[in-house]
Amino acid sequence: MDREIRILHTADTHLGYRQYHSEVRRQDFFKAFETVIQDAVDMQVDAVVHAGDLFDSRNPTLEDLLETMNILSRLKAVDIPFFGIVGNHESKQNTQWLDLFEEMGLAERLGKTPKLVGNTTIYGIDSVPKSKIPLYDYSGFELPDSLPENCKKLLVMHQIVQPFPYADWDCAEVLENLPFKVDAILLGDYHKYEKIKVGEEETWATYSGSTERNSASENEPRSYNIITLSGEGLEISRRTIPTRNFLFITAKIDGEEKPYEQIFSAINEHLEEIPESVVFLDISGNSDSVLSFSEIEEYLLSKGALVSKVKDARIKETLPEEVAKVAFSDPDHAVAEEIRRMSLNDGGLIVDEIIRSPDVVRSRVDEETENRLLRLIETIDFEDPDFRIEIPASPISSTDSIDPVSPINHPVSSADSVSAVSPESSADHVSPDIIENNEKPIPAVEAEKIETLDPAGETEFVAGIAGKTETFRAPVRIKNSESLNEALKKSYEAPDKVREAPDVNPEPPEPLPAFKNIGSPETFGSCETTVSSEVPEKGGERTELEDDAVNKTEKETGKLSGFGVEAGSEKEDADRIEKPAHVPDKAEKPVKQSQRKGKGKSAVPRQYNLGDYL
């Protein structure tokens, strides 16, 4: 060997790391790296080798890049080459940051092609994921065309290798598979300084350690290595780097009284060391007192600490063993159970499958979902109720269907009874419970006596027939000997066909002043009724004006023979047809429709239509 070669070996600088969210700590990492580079310039080393994790992130900020280039330019100014490999923290898919610096003439990326420094060749292997280590290809390593006499070979890696802790690659295996003998392996990724001999040839393997503390557990001094190669062999020496102080304080609480005084007393014992330090306070002892961590941290900051961290070890000490145990469930089983609990329909299951499928890329989720749902819709017959998901409604109470109520004290809600007047209340929509018992639903009514029309004892009532969305009031003639409920039941069970009224054209009744038009004549079963198209705007007792109007109406309609409907032309009937409006009563209480049956269409069990979701 013609002359002695000195190479500075460093690694794990983690530039750009804002430790504890502190801008000062970010600057500390750059200062440590700057110290290393300045030492290389001052010692006039032959080269600087960086063994990975130059940056803490694969996406450093522009400010981080500019500061790094300014520091590396110091080496370029004195013709000291900077060699590096890619670590796991900064690794990108294609072009690496080292490639950018190489284009700028600030660095050179190591690989299977050697870099020559004097009579020393340097190779590099970028960080390899653990899963790809068994597949690593050792072929392709080249030797210089003409090897210098007594040429030394160095290999740079960013990997934790055996026999070091947490190793995932056998260092001896690497040495055996290389096509040449290596004099030393310069390593990165392990933040602690280490130096041992490995393999049958007893090759040196060394970690330089990180240049700054990345965690509180890294309590040893930070350093870098100087590799000296000469005719006498290879020598590895360590140089430490001055870094910010990490101060650890322990406070033990004895008894329940004055815990803060005991803690502050322990802190005050280190007042000279606290300024500009990163301070960690561990609290132990009696756990009965409750402490405010923020108050303690503020006290440390008031004493000059750069960063203050408080750890309460008492919590861990008081936890019972069974509480401290952690159990993990199968994630696939948990997801399947949650999907089952959600009761998704076919469309929901399709969307869930697409979103969680690893075979569908994110950019194609919307397109794939739309296509699958369209195919599902094409296979569905929306007129066939079989594709619906039926949820049985709650059983109907007998009191909901046959108990008459007073129009004053017990107003009828449109959600409480069946609209026998509406076409929606046909036999096709009767509750299955009623069909099974061979009974027809009997509507709840509100009724009040109007007058006796003839000596035969027929009395006319105004019956409020409560439907799904509207309320009608209709005069119904019954005999005195029959109760209103029996009359309504008889009328409802009669044939559906309505007998035609004789050709009598009664004069239309005079309009009533405080009345509101809400509907047209309708039929209630076979009981031919005249449904008054006018009802009072407000509930309550009938006024004399209303009684006179009703009496006059009945006298006019009494000319009809038997039970008949109000006669008129088709045009007049069509003109009177309009959607009835529900006249709510002040005392009416809302009732959930899902709690009752026998209400027209709502008598069918509640259904969820897939079309509603699509």
UniProtKB/Swiss-Prot annotation:
Cofactor field: Mn(2+)
UniProt xrefs under InterPro entries: Calcineurin-like_PHP_ApaH (IPR004843), DNA_Repair-Maintenance_Comp (IPR050535), Metallo-depent_PP-like (IPR029052), Mre11_archaea-type (IPR032885), Mre11_N (IPR041796)
Positions of Mn(2+) 2 binding: D53, N88, H158, D189
SUPFAM superfamilies: Metallo-dependent phosphatases
Pfam families: Metallophos
Active site: H89
GO term, biological process aspect, one: double-strand break repair
Ranges of compositional bias, category Basic and acidic residues: 487-502, 535-558, 568-591
Chain ranges passing through the membrane: none
Residues annotated for Mn(2+) 1 binding in this entry: D12, H14, D53, H191
UniProt keyword terms in alphabetical order: DNA damage, DNA repair, Endonuclease, Exonuclease, Hydrolase, Manganese, Metal-binding, Nuclease
Region of interest: Disordered: 393-434, 487-614
Regulation of protein activity: Nuclease activity is regulated by Rad50.
Low complexity bias spans: 411-425
Binding note for cofactor: Binds 2 manganese ions per subunit.
Family to which the UniProt record says this protein belongs: Belongs to the MRE11/RAD32 family.
Protein role: Part of the Rad50/Mre11 complex, which is involved in the early steps of DNA double-strand break (DSB) repair. The complex may facilitate opening of the processed DNA ends to aid in the recruitment of HerA and NurA. Mre11 binds to DSB ends and has both double-stranded 3'-5' exonuclease activity and single-stranded endonuclease activity.
Known partners and oligomeric status: Homodimer. Forms a heterotetramer composed of two Mre11 subunits and two Rad50 subunits.
Name of the protein in question: DNA double-strand break repair protein Mre11
Organism: Methanosarcina acetivorans (strain ATCC 35395 / DSM 2834 / JCM 12185 / C2A)
